[in-house]
A protein has these predicted regions:
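Conserved beta-strand in the GNAT
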Residues: 61, 66-76, 82-89
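Residues that form or flank phosphate/diphosphate-binding pockets in enzymes
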Residues: 18, 80, 98
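Short strand-loop junctions, especially beta-strand C-caps/beta-turns
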Residues: 10-13, 88-93
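Short loop/turn motifs at secondary-structure junctions and domain boundaries
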Residues: 49-54
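Short amphipathic alpha-helix that is part of the acyltransferase structural core
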Residues: 1-47
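Conserved acetyl-CoA-binding loop-helix of GNAT-fold acetyltransferases
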Residues: 90, 95-107
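Short loop/turn microsegments at loop-to-beta-strand junctions
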Residues: 57-58
């Protein structure tokens, strides 16, 4: 039995990739309604991240042994050289300190 966990970070640059749908499931199940950004708006910005005038947008999925277990959304504001972490969401089934801190450090 192999208990090794291999975490990988993958940047989302298109809403057409299969990982996007898994990430949105995790996002909608993990984030409270009042704090949620519309998934249509997230989809738009994933597909048009280069149009963000203030800096750079980043959308990531966390993979554990090639299974999508997390989603993160960040913005880098060039003028103030500030990195904002908007969301870090991890599937409840995989939610642990190991998964969270691995995701955080990979970002």
């Amino acid at each position: 039995m192999n208990n090794n966990v291999d975490y990988k970070l993958m940047r989302l640059t298109s809403s057409k990739c299969s990982e996007y749908f898994e990430a949105m499931k995790i996002y909608t199940q993990s984030v409270e309604y009042i704090q949620k950004t519309s998934t249509n708006e997230i989809k738009y910005w994933i597909d048009h991240f280069k149009k963000f005038a203030l800096g750079d947008l980043f959308f990531f999925v966390l993979l554990s042994n090639d299974i999508v277990i997390g989603y993160a959304e960040l913005a880098y504001i060039k003028k103030s050289r500030t990195l904002l972490i908007d969301y870090i969401a991890i599937d409840k089934q995989y939610n642990s300190n190991s998964a969270f801190y691995s995701f955080y450090w990979l970002i």
